Amino acid sequence: MGSTAISTQQAFCSLQKFTPLSYASSCRSLRSRRKWAVPARCCSPATDVATAAKENRRELLKNGDDKLEICRVLNGMWQTSGGWGRIDRNDAVEAMLNYADDGLSTFDMADHYGPAEDLYGIFINRVRRERPPELLETVRGLTKWVPPPVKMTRSFVSESIDVSRRRMDVAALDMLQFHWWDYSNPGYLDALKHLTDLKGEGKIKTIALTNFDTERLRIILENGIPVVSNQVQHSIVDMRPQQKMAELCQLTGVKLITYGTVMGGLLSEKFLDTNLTIPFAGPALNTPSLQKYKRMVDAWGGWSLFQELLRTLKTVANKHGVSIPTVAVRFILDQPAVAGSMIGVRLGLSQHIKDANAVFSLVLDVEDISNILQVTNKGRDLQKVIGDCGDEYRRA
């Protein structure tokens, strides 16, 4: 990586102290190195908001000849896995159609997200029957495979992928994102080599990772696996991916897809000016995600500092006429190596189409960034507290 890219990583990727000037300079330098960046994306007001929003909607992931274009705001379907309320199949599919009709046409799921893959199969068939070919061409279904700790034989890997293909009713998976629990078991390389072979047979279009750390990503790439992206937890509070991981990604062209970007809903007006230290005084932490990300807040700096962050984000949101979640997502999309950010969808229960689409036209200026960083710099460096990307899932 050249000196410009390294200075960008140091100026904006670590949880050190930043200045608006260094941020703006880094953005200008990095834009010239990244095809996806919109001119003056994060450093000056947009002269044509509509054009900027259109150009900023989609991102091309690639490794060699493998390519996949996705919407930069992805619909996360983990909330179909239980714990967020009962999902009605018909209502869920109608909601998916609404998201796709409004340009939010990339869906992220997994083999273990309850009926997510089955819902996608019903949805994609309705798109084929009821929507114009132009919309079908933009729809993407990204799934994950989280195998048990067994020997990764060719037949086992192939049969597992065939299950997802049948459930999603596609000849080839747009993207298979691979997860592995235990790094001491090198079977992950065997699995990825089999997945690469299946890609060559036309059963998978692109291979990606989820929750892998920087060292394992390096090993995987050195073994010739054509990884296009790594899905990791990344938010204004959790900036770990902007340390070692982003540097390797900039060197190799691998992109980041982020989840936890609105922290399960904690980064929203709902939790502004609340006191969770008093039982029943504030909104209930009544989903697995809210409980998980509240623990992340505690590790980062506590509820009082988090309230200061929410107040700052609210000021920025009011300035631009958007919501706190919209600001939170835009901030992460502007980070080096980030191709897209996930927002969880409670299909048939609630929707965030307006807020999600507002992300594309939002331009955070130097003052906005400076005000946000003044707060986040007070928090702990979670790389030191938790470890690298995905380490939270592998701690003893």
Regions found by a protein language model. Give the residues of each.
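N-terminal binding-site loop/beta-alpha segment at the start of enzyme catalytic domains
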Residues: G2-V139
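Active-site mouth loops of central-metabolism enzymes
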Residues: W78-N90, W145-F156, W180-P186
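Short, acidic/polar
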Residues: R86-A100, M152-D169, D190, D213-I219
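Active-site groove signature of glycoside hydrolases
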Residues: R165-G187
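Short beta-strand segments at enzyme active-site cores
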Residues: T106-D111, L173-Q177, A208-L209, T326-A328
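A short, structured active-site edge motif that brings together acidic residues
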Residues: L135-P149, L176-F178
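Beta/alpha (TIM)-barrel catalytic core signal, keyed to glycine-rich beta->alpha loops juxtaposed to Asp/Glu
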Residues: R57-L60, W181-Q383, D391-A396
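A structural motif
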Residues: D101-L104, V170-L173, I204, V227, ...
